[in-house]
A protein has these predicted regions:
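Positively charged, helix-rich recognition surfaces that bind polyanionic ligands
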Residues: 1-342
Length: 342
């Protein structure tokens, strides 16, 4: 493909921490593959071609160089480009949405732990509404009745990531997987229907949600002790709403590795990797069919970003600086969230 399509190879830039920290066998397998690939492409020959033909034994393609040490290969080795793996699998490929809420702050020994903090979190939302039939938004989201959590990341404690797009509306679209643990071990999985769960919760507490009003109005009047169950249950449903990757254990279903986005995309749909799994033989569908495929797709997009950087900054008069190939998280999110590759 490199020869036929004038293509590049894009790989994860797995740092020294990965190579030191993984199991010895896994580390050795990866390094062996990396070395073999570089060596193979250093002088690529096609056996079926004549000796003096391009690609023949006397005129092989030199597509890489042999580094003194694989540790010092940098961001590029000929046609092989190395890009950081950050935010490539747990990301919505259609909108660039990532979940950067720092939910660890709200964890505790029980589901009703830190009720005050969870209430403050919910009140920091821009709005919490139920989208009912008859509203403009109902038409926009494909005639679905869903709950909508609108928020601005600037109003929350998040991981140390700067997102170019901070305002989002997360809908309770699709199912999520809740992992159940016992004694610190993954016991089994539970399938959550977010919308059904929230409807039951609202009805249990006699909240008139169907009129589409901002449910924060009800939360603001709630006593944290008497309504701890409601506050914490609503918080949990929100937490699973923004959970993109949903996997089951190998014992349950080793092939279940699904990405479901709560964000409405430009096609007025929601990205669900299972939609593309069912149509994987249909070449008109180009979106990733599972979380692993999404990682590969986004790694490729980062490679495209670097190629564009080279084109924009190349000059025959001066040496191209290696740090020009560095792509930080903010640049990457801007690239995918604002669809700068289209």
């Amino acid at each position: 493909m490199v020869i036929d399509y004038n293509a590049i190879i894009v790989m994860e830039d797995l740092n020294k921490g990965f190579k030191r920290g993984r199991f010895k066998v896994e580390r050795q397998v990866y390094q062996k593959f990396e070395n073999m690939l570089i060596s193979k492409l250093n002088y690529l020959v096609f056996k079926e071609r004549k000796a003096d033909e391009n690609g023949g034994i006397l005129r092989g393609y030199q597509l890489t160089y042999i580094p003194k040490s694989i540790k010092n290969v940098g961001k590029q080795c000929g046609c092989i480009f190395y890009v950081p793996a950050a935010y490539t699998s747990k990301i919505d490929p259609s909108t660039g949405f990532i979940n950067i809420f720092d939910f660890k702050k709200y964890s505790g020994s029980g589901i009703n732990a830190k009720v005050k903090d969870k209430k403050e979190f919910l009140m920091s939302m821009n709005s919490i509404r139920y989208i009912n039939e008859g509203s403009e938004e109902y038409e926009k989201i494909g005639h679905r009745e869903l709950f909508a959590f609108s928020f601005d990341y600037d109003n929350f404690k998040t991981y140390n990531v700067s997102s170019p797009v901070n305002e989002w509306t997360a809908y309770t679209y699709g199912e999520r997987i809740k992992k159940l643990y016992k004694d610190g071990r993954w016991l089994r999985s539970e399938v959550l229907n977010l919308t059904e769960n929230l409807i039951k919760l609202m009805e249990q507490y006699n909240i008139e949600y169907k009129d589409g009003h901002d449910i924060r109005e009800d939360i603001s009047h709630m006593d944290e002790t008497r309504n701890a169950d409601f506050i914490c249950s609503l918080f949990e449903e929100l937490k699973y709403t923004v959970q993109l990757r949903n996997s089951k254990s190998e014992a349950e279903d080793e092939n279940y590795d699904r990405l479901v986005s709560p964000i409405l995309n430009s096609s007025n749909g929601f990205y669900d990797s299972s939609d593309y799994m069912e149509n994987e033989n249909n070449t008109t569908h180009t979106m990733p069919k599972d979380a692993d495929a999404n990682g590969a797709y986004c790694i490729a997009l980062k490679g495209l970003y670097e190629i564009n950087k080279i084109k924009q900054n190349w000059s025959d008069d001066k040496k191209f600086k290696e740090n020009e190939l560095y792509i930080n998280v903010t640049e990457w999110l801007d690239y995918i969230q604002n669809r700068r590759f289209e």
